[in-house]
């Protein structure tokens, strides 16, 4: 039973619960296509907090609330500044009196923990500096949609990436295989990796790290990348780009993957940097399906948790 719980990290849930989210995501896609969406959020109010700019997450989440019959109240960085002036605890207490649930894209993951504790309402992680669970759920929905089942994946680029963290969490819970190609200095932090490793041992998941991207993608069905420089990393942008220049997803790299492999990217992409135009626009690209599926995953999560 997920109703009333917060979704801050996938590690908090069983493989059965995670699978139930994926299954409902597929159902929501069918409901939208049939124009018969259940109004599971009717008479409910959802606060959507965005400390960071957002395109896909904001549009998909706002639209999800609307389609489910709810009302969304969007609070951008100029409307709300968590922990600046008013404490996050006080903000959470007030929001908890007004709304039925909170979705938040935050600069500091700890803000999500505080919002959940003090609002006493379900809080959905719409991205933090640590993780992005909605994206990982969307990604593996897309994988299952393409192949009929979950399959092996290679992530190329920054091993400290927040989307990668959630991909690893999903893999560790579901007993899958993930290969990560990155320079040694761009590996997950120990505090992040510790719990993922524990869950992997329980489920039989295999998460391996490579320095050679060609070795990592050999024979895999899914090749995934993300931007090299995230928001807030502008001061180290040039340094990161130099160190990651050999981790671009190219047509040549894709040839080493399975013949029916797909390319994935959570967007926005910096074309010519982490991925070539020929790949993201090519026949193997599943990027636009991913973007569409964000809506259905958001609908499933909102329906189950709030």
Swiss-Prot record:
Its EC number is 2.1.3.3. Carbamoyl phosphate binds at residues 54-57, 81, 105, 132-135, 266-267, 294. It is an enzyme of class 2 (transferase). PROSITE patterns: CARBAMOYLTRANSFERASE. GO terms for molecular function: amino acid binding; ornithine carbamoyltransferase activity. It is found in: Cytoplasm. The keyword Signal does not apply. GO terms for biological process: arginine biosynthetic process via ornithine; citrulline biosynthetic process; L-arginine biosynthetic process. Keywords: Amino-acid biosynthesis, Arginine biosynthesis, Cytoplasm, Transferase. L-ornithine binds at residues 162, 226, 230-231. Pathway: Amino-acid biosynthesis; L-arginine biosynthesis; L-arginine from L-ornithine and carbamoyl phosphate: step 1/3. It catalyses: carbamoyl phosphate + L-ornithine = L-citrulline + phosphate + H(+). GO terms for cellular component: cytoplasm. This is Ornithine carbamoyltransferase. The gene is argF.
């Amino acid at each position: 039973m997920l109703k009333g719980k917060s979704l801050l990290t996938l590690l908090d849930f069983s493989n059965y619960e995670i699978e139930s989210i994926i299954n409902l995501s597929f159902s929501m896609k069918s409901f939208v296509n049939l124009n018969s969406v259940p109004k599971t959020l009717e008479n409910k109010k959802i606060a959507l907090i965005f400390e960071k700019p957002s395109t896909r997450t904001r549009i998909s989440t706002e639209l999800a609330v609307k389609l489910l019959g709810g009302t969304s109240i969007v609070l951008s960085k100029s409307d709300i500044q968590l922990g600046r002036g008013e404490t996050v605890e006080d903000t959470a207490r007030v929001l908890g009196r007004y709304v039925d649930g909170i979705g938040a894209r935050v600069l500091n993951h700890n803000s999500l923990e505080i919002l959940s504790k003090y609002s006493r309402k379900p809080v959905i992680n719409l991205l933090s500096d640590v993780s992005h669970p909605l994206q990982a759920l969307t990604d593996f929905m897309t994988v299952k949609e393409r192949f009929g089942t979950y399959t092996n994946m290679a992530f190329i680029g920054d091993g400290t990436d927040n989307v990668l963290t959630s991909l690893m969490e999903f893999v560790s819970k579901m007993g899958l295989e993930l290969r990560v190609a990155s320079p040694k200095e761009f590996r997950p932090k120990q505090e992040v990796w510790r719990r993922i490793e524990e869950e992997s041992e329980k489920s039989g998941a295999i998460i391996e790290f490579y320095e050679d991207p060609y070795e990592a993608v050999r024979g895999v069905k899914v090749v995934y990348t993300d931007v090299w420089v995230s928001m807030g990393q502008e001061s180290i942008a040039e340094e990161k780009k130099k160190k990651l220049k050999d981790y671009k997803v190219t047509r040549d790299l894709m040839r080493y993957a399975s013949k029916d492999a797909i390319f994935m990217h959570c967007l926005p992409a910096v074309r010519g940097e982490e991925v070539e135009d020929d790949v993201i626009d090519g026949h193997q690209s599943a990027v636009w399906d991913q973007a569409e599926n964000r809506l259905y995953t958001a609908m499933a999560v909102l329906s189950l948790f709030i």
